[in-house]
Amino acid sequence: MVISINQVRQLYVAKALKANTAALTTAGDIVPKADTAKTTLYFQSMSPAGIVASDKINLKHVLYAKATPSEALAHKLVRYSVTLDADVSATPVAGQNYILRLAFRQYIGLSEEDQYFKYGEVIARSGMTASDFYKKMAISLAKNLENKTESTPLVNIYLISAAAASTDVPVTSATKESDLTATDYNQIIIEETEQPWVLGMMPQAFIPFTPQFLTITVDGEDRLWGVATVVTPTKTVPDGHLIADLEYFCMGARGDIYRGMGYPNIIKTTYLVDPGAVYDVLDIHYFYTGSNESVQKSEKTITLVAVDDGSHTAMNALIGAINTASGLTIATL
């Protein structure tokens, strides 16, 4: 979802669907309305300051209307599996210095050139097993990633054993080798983490990274010792923060133009989105066109968001009410 000043968007938080205007009593109540001939559609909703109405949409000018489920807006945390390259050596080569580098991009700034590097290091000894190697490398990486100035880790590190392939064993800077009791660890998982978010100030961010390998010497040749593979994500970050930021952004077109400047001498804006919830989204994209020199299409979007209970109940009810009132055939979720 792109939040841009180049697109005219009206946002309405639909907390409760109502049957008529008289039933609008609580902030977030909403009712879709149309004329008898079903040529125009508009919404009335209860804002924190009273009843408001949307644009009146000429139904012939609707370009599209599409619902997006909450899971489509959720962010899947990227996971890499790091293993020894069996084509080089499936077991650690004694005497070699194994170095794993994590290259973080867009760190602090948004440029790909804003890079930050962290390392894990293991010196292979005679008789070291692959399982022992993975333990040492995971612990080394976790300790080197520790930063007292960062409240949130840049990545999460896990070990996976052959006997429990679906179980993540977390490794932190406090983990000791004696805490890791399995003898069949066969990969290290490095997972993206959700970074701190502050409404309207710090967007929901994730720091992209790439595992990189330095070379070791095997049979007289310099070889990259490992393989990093992107694997199926197991964790997601829901869209609550994204929708909350969208509401904050859209409020800038409804009088909240100073964004808290002059605090504490300000009028606080009441927001309806719960950042801890998950939301389905409905976009109705349409245009206005006038006569004479105003015949060009002026495109707009009305966006309605509703809490997803896991079955899209609220959004599907809202879509049904819109279809009934207007004659549109918006697909439900």
Swiss-Prot record:
Signal peptide: none
A cellular component term, taken from the record's GO annotations: viral capsid, decoration
Keyword field: Capsid decoration protein, Capsid protein, Virion
Localization, UniProt: Virion
Annotated spans, FD: 75-237
Highest taxon of the lineage: Viruses
Domain notes: The central region FD is structurally similar to Helicobacter pylori flagellar cap protein FliD.
Known function: Auxiliary capsid protein that forms an outer layer on the major capsid protein protrusions.
Oligomeric and partner information: Interacts (via FD region) with the major capsid protein.
Protein name listed in UniProt: Auxiliary capsid protein
Organism: Bacteroides phage crAss001
Source organism phylogeny: Viruses, Duplodnaviria, Heunggongvirae, Uroviricota, Caudoviricetes
